[in-house]
Each structure stands twice: as structure tokens, then as C-alpha cells.
């Protein structure tokens, strides 16, 4: 359903292109008739007449998705003082390491800024002490070279220490859908086989 929308606003006319880009880069303000709020965990929740009543013949999935009339989108984000919504990461892609929440997208941006990196996916993998640790799966650009220590050090100059990958694995390719979207559930699966993911 349509939950938010970006509208052309007269006050944008006086903004610089950079300021306008920030405002228009958000997911938008709640559409007419939609109530949006954040859960205590930072998940975006929405309530509106057009939100589904539930999943067809899937009562457990419905109970997880709709609580107290609010649809749990699965997106983590924020709401600013203009009531505009920003989506920061998928809830299931947030890594919880040592009690700290780490956005996989933020780490991917840091890794991707290394000139040798062509593709990257960041996932949480089991760690005996911290619950999860940050793993970066990297595809290098043709003819480029980099090692694990170099990628980690690159990230340490851009991120808080706990957000940096502790492990970097190099791959020839990453699992994607036919439309090119990363399939993180497939990338995570081998690491969590035989383990219950209790931290997320």
C-alpha cells in the first residue's frame, strides 16, 4: 500500500540543491489517512484503511506483521521533525553485535568506498561472545587487489570500531535475484545452518 509520499513544496524553492536532495532523499511524509510511527526498536509501523487485514491462511505471519492495528513494515528508520520518514535498513538486515545495532547498509557504504571494491554485501554471522559479528562479502573490481586487513582498516577510518567488519571474504559473485537485488538470506544461510538466530 501507499504509506508515504514526497510532494513538491514551495519552501524547497529557497533551498540549495544539496539541501533539497537531502529532503527529497527521504521516503516521504505519511500519505493522507496514514499514521506512521516507530516501535521502541526503531521499526517503522503504519496504520491505514488500505493496509491489509492479514496474510491469506497464514495466522502466525499475520500475528507477527499486524500488532494493535499497526503493520510492521520490517524497515528500520526514523521520523524527522517534519514527519518525513527515512528508511535506514531492513530490520532483518540489522546486525546486533555485543548489544549494539549495526546497519548493514552503513557498513556496505564504507566498504564500497574502497576503490578496489566492485560489489559488497554485509551480513551478521554467529559469534560466541558477541552473538553476531560483522562479515563483509566482497567482489573486487577487475584487475584490482585488496586484502582483508586493508578493507577493515579502510572502514576504521569511516566507522565506529564496533561497526567495522571483523571478517572479509572475497567472492567471484554474490547471490542476486533476476532483477539484481542481493539475496542476503541466501548469503547468510550457510553461516547459520544448525544454529538458531536469537539475536534478531
Where are these regions (language model features)?
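Short loop/turn motifs at secondary-structure junctions and domain boundaries
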Residues: 27-30, 129, 164-167
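AMP-binding/adenylate-forming catalytic core of the ANL superfamily
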Residues: 38, 48, 53-54, 74-163, ...
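Hydrophobic/anchoring residues in structured secondary elements
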Residues: 122, 169-170
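Residues at the N-termini of beta-strands
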Residues: 43, 119, 166-167
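Conserved ATP/PPi-binding loop(s) of AMP-dependent carboxylate-activating enzymes
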Residues: 26-33, 39-68, 82, 100
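Active-site loops of AMP-binding adenylate-forming
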Residues: 1-25, 29-32, 58-61
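Extracytoplasmic/periplasmic beta-strand context in beta-sandwich domains
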Residues: 3, 166-167, 185
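Acidic/polar alpha-helix N-cap and adjacent early helical turns
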Residues: 189-200
Amino acid at each position: 500500500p501507499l504509506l508515504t509520499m514526497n510532494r513538491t513544496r514551495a519552501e524547497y524553492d529557497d533551498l540549495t540543491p544539496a539541501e533539497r536532495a537531502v529532503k527529497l532523499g527521504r521516503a516521504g511524509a505519511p500519505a493522507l489517512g496514514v499514521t506512521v510511527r516507530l516501535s521502541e526498536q526503531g521499526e517503522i509501523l503504519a496504520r491505514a484503511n488500505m493496509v491489509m487485514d492479514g496474510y491469506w491462511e497464514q495466522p502466525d505471519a499475520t500475528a507477527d506483521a499486524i500488532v494493535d492495528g499497526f503493520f510492521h513494515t520490517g524497515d528500520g528508520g526514523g521520523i524527522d521533525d517534519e514527519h518525513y520518514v527515512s528508511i535506514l535498513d531492513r530490520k532483518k538486515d540489522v546486525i546486533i553485535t555485543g548489544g549494539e545495532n549495526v546497519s548493514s547498509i552503513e557498513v556496505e557504504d564504507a566498504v564500497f568506498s574502497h576503490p578496489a571494491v566492485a560489489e559488497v554485501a554485509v551480513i551478521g554471522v554467529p559469534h560466541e561472545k558477541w552473538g553476531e559479528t560483522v562479515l563483509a562479502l566482497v567482489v573486487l573490481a577487475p584487475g584490482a587487489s585488496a586484502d582483508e586487513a586493508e578493507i577493515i582498516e579502510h572502514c576504521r577510518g569511516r566507522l565506529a570500531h564496533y561497526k567495522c567488519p571483523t571478517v572479509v571474504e572475497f567472492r567471484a559473485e554474490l547471490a542476486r535475484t533476476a532483477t539484481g537485488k542481493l539475496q542476503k538470506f541466501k548469503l547468510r544461510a550457510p553461516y547459520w545452518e544448525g544454529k538458531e538466530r536469537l539475536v534478531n
